[in-house]
Amino acid sequence: MSDILNSAISGMNAMKIMIDNTIDKINHPNNKTLGKRVVIENTVQNENKNSTVKVKEIYDNYNDFILEEKRKTNAEVQDEQTKIEQLLKLEDLLCEKSNIFSQLLNDYYAQIEEDIVLAKKNVFNENIQKKLSNIVFAIKDFDKKLKFLEKDIKDSVINNLKKVNSLIDEIHDLTIDIRCFPVLKFPNRVDGLIEQRDRLVDELNGLIGIKVIKDHDNYKLNLNNGISIIDNNKKQNLIALTSTSDERYISVGYVDTNDKVAKKIEDMIPTATLGALLKFRREELTNTRNKIGQLIINFADSINSYHAIGYDMFGHLGRQIFNISQPEVIASSSNRSSSKVSAKWLVISDAKNTNYVIYFKDKNFIVTRLSDHSTIQPKVHVENNKTLFTFDGIECSIEGENADNDIYMIKPYSKTLEELELLIKPNEPFAYSSTDDLNNPNRNNAIIINKFYNNVLVDHKETLDQAYQKFSQSISHKCNALEEEVPFKRNMIGILENKKMSISNDMEQEYAELNYEQECYLANVKVLQTAENILNEIIERYS
């Protein structure tokens, strides 16, 4: 809304300057010292120019302004509508699996209380084994369905890129046809080609968001602060960027013919359908995998930590119940060193739901959380010719010398859901006693584990269920906010669409008796009045 109003006000200010300049020339026709203001292609600069053509330029520039604002708004609508569609899918998944950290975990703790704490059955326990298996199965199913959403986004990006490239090809061909068209011989027929190109540009804008630049005979389509995909008779098609190490990864780039390499340009497509898909993959889907991963390892580690130091009915020391995957380290392909980097969990209770970037500069490691782009200072020490540094419960180990500007990506939860595994085998006794004295066994560890359901395990401030519900609600709130915005912006498109202006087909006769200054004045007054009507209509509809 504010972007549209600001642009409209800027446009009206420019129109006001033109009108003031025209009035000055009318009131002081012999004053040669008046400063000339160049506004909208020097409208009142050349008095010898054909007045009809110049008046048409005023209308064309106004319509271009309206069209640009309409395209901006439409790109936002497509962006938000796409986000809503994807958020609803994610919201459905989170709602479907909301019982994992409530009912299923509660069933497990209740079974411990019933069989171990109260009934004192510190024996082979099929009931507890079944409850744990139910939790693992639910997590695996969550991972399966989350992967489906990730694959769906990847497929959608690839399919939309095919549409984008098809439109780029068509617009490129039409631009060449328009530039080569014999306008003087067939002055009215070129308008049909221009209208056809405009329709294709509208469609392309809804997919990737573009800016049209027209300057005399030049015609360009640019991405947001980026490359030109149409530059007169040149075109630049886009490509999908994938990864051999991560089948879920998808981005957008182009082939630089000079460097003969593929370059990533995801940041140049911040809005529209494609921008929304990329951002949803980059943010919401990544955040979901990280959040669920954080909850899982907090739960699994809390159980492991006491079961591994407990004793079973035979006095044997217990072991971990769950397998917890280690963080994944990805080295940048641009790194100049060949050092080996690995990562492992050191203190899981300190785990954060974020990925990290590690940057090596001037013999220092700079660690950035990607969730909020905050920088943290790791604790660094050298041991056995290895550089070890810790942050947020993770220990990274680097073997070998690093070079300046080396970059590493740390993904703590990329495999957490997939590799979660129940290590306890059927008919294997649980180790819930805190002593190996077979004559005086107890159930102390079971009592401690039973209390974990109400403990603040996540970020030292939330229970597992509280953290899950909070995250799920944040997705719902985001979706609801977008659903409220979209109808308003759709109405804005309608308002702008109805405010285009045209001039009489018989302009020569209609303006024959008006001098050049009067024509410009009347044209600009009409533009200003129309802009005022737009604002009034917005205020009346939404006040």
Swiss-Prot record:
Localisation per UniProt entry: Secreted; Bacterial flagellum
Record's keyword terms, sorted? Bacterial flagellum, Secreted
Main subcellular location of this protein, as a coarse class: secreted
Against SUPFAM superfamilies, the record matches this protein to:
Phase 1 flagellin
One CC-aspect GO term = bacterial-type flagellum hook
Residue ranges that the Swiss-Prot or TrEMBL entry lists as coiled coil: none
Q: Which GO terms describe its biological process?
A: bacterial-type flagellum assembly
A GO molecular-function annotation: structural molecule activity
A Pfam family per the record: FlgK_D1
Q: Which PANTHER family match?
A: FLAGELLAR HOOK PROTEIN, FLAGELLAR HOOK-ASSOCIATED PROTEIN 1
The UniProt family comment states: Belongs to the flagella basal body rod proteins family.
Put simply, this protein is called Flagellar hook-associated protein 1
This protein's encoding gene: flgK
